[in-house]
Amino acid sequence: MFGQELKKMGIATAYRYIEKNPKDNLRKLMTWVDRIAGEGPDSFEEQRKVIWDILDHPESNMYQLIMRVIEEVDPEVVKTVFSNFFLNAAILGWPKQEKLRAEYNCNIPWAILLDPTSACNLHCTGCWAAEYGNKLNLTFDELDSIIEQGKELGIYFYIYTGGEPLVRKNDLIALCKKHSDCIFLSFTNATLIDEAFADDMLRVKNFVPAISVEGDMAAHDGRRGKGSYEKVEKAMKLLKEKKLPFGVSCCYTSANCDSISSDEFYDWLVDKGVLFAWYFHYMPVGNDAVPQLMPTPSQREMMYDRVRYCRRTKPLFAIDFQNDGEYVGGCVAGGRRYLHINANGDVDPCVFIHYSDSNIREKTLLECLQSPLFMAYHENQPFNENHLRPCPMLENPQKLREMVAKTQAKSTDMQSPESAEHLCSKCDEYAKNWTPSAEKLWNESHKE
């Protein structure tokens, strides 16, 4: 505890450099971060080297991104996000998680995804969340308890999914206020972001929205309904004016790959004030899913190249949940780095894999992590030595079939339960077709 307090004091001292003269003192800040992080396996040495390399190249796009954060985001918000994300969730939280992973011999996540509600004011084509219905909610006290339990395990990063989380925006802001040492990110369709909510975000300083965007107006409104794109632009304008950080969430499909990976799209994001873009591969989850929306192998290869191109050239941080598996050792679900708790309290291994043998209303968070299904993940990860084939459903469907059968996990889709066989059968052909591309890309990136 004493060591943690010293680190917090060190960060506070370091951040004063940024407040006084941010552009000139970034290197001093990183020197402080190096001292606080120390040495050893939990010191984020590789990540710190990357940041130093960015600071050594002020002409680079990533340096420009750092400047955007400093210039475009409220200084107190930057300070809070820096402290809660980099200090609490990473430098302090990670070593505690590693210790507990060894102590309990199970996965301890870095982040928890929560569905405050299954309610949503839109009905998007192919959306898996619609399978839950619209009447389920985790109470404020249940959400609060999950966060309290998470913090005991060293977890300070919480991500809201849904449904539309902002249906519960008053509770979400209250949780931000109560857990001021945590960082909260929320996926949202942006239709409920108004000036009052933006002011609340500015007040609590630890809430970051990730707005769902499908591409240009035609692509977006085609999946989310006429007028949705206009509401997204209105929300982005408001957030930028309030100097609040935000990003986008992009589900890439066979229909929109070109639209959401073009230079025009990336430049539009930067112009609107977007700081990060989180890409997700369309998953055929649910009985009403549309398998035809799954990208072809050539489209997925194109997304692999385009997201990396964006990271090399644009002042925007792009992440691909599926194609960046090579950077995180494959599948991160099952509590290895994150888990998902739906609005019914069911603890799923992944936001895309709706099977569970535990409910947070009946077990503690740690007990859920030690359940048969989560231990099956723990014992079988990685599911493929090629981390461009990370998922036990999409690229290795036999793995999910086996784990669900062995643990007798049940479908958590409330309205229309889907068997693991039905789900995985939609992925068999895809997995077979993707394998040659994955092997080619993996071999090219591991030539040495």
Sequence positions of predicted segments:
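Conserved alpha-helical substructure of the radical SAM core
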Residues: 32-196
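Short cysteine clusters
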Residues: 120, 124-127, 331, 345, ...
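Radical SAM enzyme [4Fe-4S]-AdoMet core and its adjacent flexible, acidic
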Residues: 1-49, 53, 221-334, 343-344, ...
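Short, charged low-complexity linear segments at domain edges
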Residues: 88-109, 319, 325, 359-375
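Radical SAM/AdoMet-radical enzyme domain recognition
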Residues: 140-160, 166-280
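Flexible mid-to-C-terminal extensions adjoining Fe-S/redox cofactors in radical SAM and related proteins
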Residues: 2-24, 28-31, 39-43, 352-448
